[in-house]
Amino acid sequence: MKSFYKSFRTPSFLALAVAAALAGCAATQDAGHSAMNMVKSATGQAQVVRQDVAPALYQVAYSPSEDVVYAVSAGNPKDPASGVKPKLFKLDPETLAVKAEIELPKPGYGLTLDDDAHRLYIVDTRGGTLMVFDTTSSQVTASLTMPPVLDAQGKPEKIEYREIVVDKANNRLYLPAMSYHDSKLQVVNLETLTVERTIPGFNFGATGISMDSGAGKLYVSNLMGQLFVVDIGTLAITDRFEVQGDQLLTLVMDHDNKRLLAVDEGFDRLDVVRKERGGLNYQTRTQGNQVLALDPSSGKVLQNIKVGTQPVDLLLDAPRNRLYVSNRVSGNISVVDPRTGQEIKTIDLPTHPNSFALNPKTGTVYVTVKLPKEKSMTDKESVARISF
């Protein structure tokens, strides 16, 4: 998700709020990691294995067919002479030892896996390049640089990419294109690897996306408390809801309970960004630091789930009734019962726990853990394995 923390004046400052994809700045105590720790609670224990891997780690994926963990590193694009190259890592799912590392042609940030097709889709958040990685040959087999998006004056707009959703039934990818003004949704045709449609109208900071393929709907959220519904058949926005939430960074569909789960981040400087960069006269609705359960048909808040400070990513393990939330600033993972909203346990993972992946067979969770921004591009960041 990540540094983008130089000043409010830099165009990429919007990505400060997108810490699930990009690096951040708040610093707490950290150390090297290669050992197993036991996290105790009244409901049992969690075993945590943590291993340093590489600088600039972002998203992670687990492949059931290969039984490996993939983690992507952006390298150090600001200092090519540093020798820190963008890479994709294959990790042992038990020990997290590096089994292979493959250099990428562009920095990798966002990552999603189509395991049946043996494909990883990797996006360069800043440069807008989508890479197709064949997991059988361990090679990037194709790439697409997103076309420029023009603003109202016909000038190229600064766009950043974070999440990728695979629509296998329609052979498409969906990528929110985040901007300060009119965010877009890019629809990529996988047969031709071209942009099939650019859908405008998602306003300031569209980041969250989730698909309900059974209902034929996409849900997209932004950083000004709005939830959009897109019809997958027509690729039209059919609804827009004003949610009693503020920074809807990440979305997950809870199919069993027919609701959406949304991070309400609580990034303390976003109001300044909305005003100075977005030109918005926006009234803050909440203080954030929570997960919202939403009615997808209306955007109504059904439940407020308090978590740690500045949550960024969500992972729902529905068969085991566990919702995992990475809390960036408090440096921990909240494990929540999604039915009741009650916290099951808290797992400390300083400095900044980031993005999740799940082994659906065992329930083992993998999470990238980032360092403070001054170390993120040079020192090794880690991947943690959580099991019960």
Positions of the model-derived regions?
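Gram-negative bacterial Sec-dependent N-terminal signal peptides
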Residues: 1-27
